[in-house]
């Protein structure tokens, strides 16, 4: 973790997490987004993705984990982001 004064251009940090079936179901419950492309294997198999995918905002929420625990770390709250989802995130 870093204090804001310690941040420099070019610093980096990483965060990795495997999204499981349980994560998908929990995120659907929390967000209210029960789109069958996330929850229904048969429906998703007929979609452009070919199988179930994670919610885009579930993946985007990992920015909060990265900023709040790694760079800069404790106490950091980010207030804006702009996203373009280029590739689906599949389960596991």
Spans of features found by a protein language model:
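Hot-dog-fold acyl-thioester-processing enzymes
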Residues: 1-80
